[in-house]
């Protein structure tokens, strides 16, 4: 959620902007961590300030190991990666801008426009060209060489038997 900045949000959190982005984690373990933090500090608005676990232009990690592979060389002994298991949905998070009269989606993810309208009871605001993290063309560009093959015939024994039992 992108919200109007309060006086509690320091410049190093907001980059000096008049808004702040708040992540609402889907992980029950992370929600428990945040709830415990609020209890320990006796402050219902306690939060953890943290960057994304991927470099600019990279795909968001879906496991703790992916995060370590992506940013491990930048971690210090004071840094912590909470391994709560793999992400349930392997796509970028939805980003909703709530700084105007009506919410608007900056980046689609698991949460749909209909979900936002249902949760807020409001119709979404207009769309505009917005540059949000995770929408660059490079995010879903393969890093490996890709060979496009129009047609190939493989002998039966070359096709893994598990393909017929694959779940999509």
Task: Report the location of each language-model feature.
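Active-site-adjacent structural elements in enzyme catalytic cores
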Residues: 1-165
């Amino acid at each position: 959620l992108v919200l109007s900045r309060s006086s509690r949000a320091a410049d190093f959190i907001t980059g000096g902007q008049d808004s702040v982005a708040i992540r609402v984690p889907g992980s029950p373990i992370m929600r428990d961590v945040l709830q415990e933090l609020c209890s320990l500090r006796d402050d219902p608005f306690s939060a953890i300030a943290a960057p994304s676990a991927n470099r600019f232009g990279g795909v968001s990690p879906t496991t703790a190991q992916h995060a370590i592979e992506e940013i491990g060389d930048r971690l210090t002994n004071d840094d912590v990666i909470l391994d709560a298991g793999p992400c349930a949905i392997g796509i970028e998070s939805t980003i909703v801008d709530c700084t105007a009269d009506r919410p608007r989606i900056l980046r689609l993810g698991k949460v749909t426009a209909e979900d936002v309208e249902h949760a807020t009871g409001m119709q979404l605001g207009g769309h505009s060209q917005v540059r949000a993290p995770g929408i660059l063309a490079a995010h879903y560009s393969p890093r490996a060489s890709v060979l496009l093959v129009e047609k190939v015939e493989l002998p039966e024994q070359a096709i893994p038997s598990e393909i017929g039992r694959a779940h999509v």
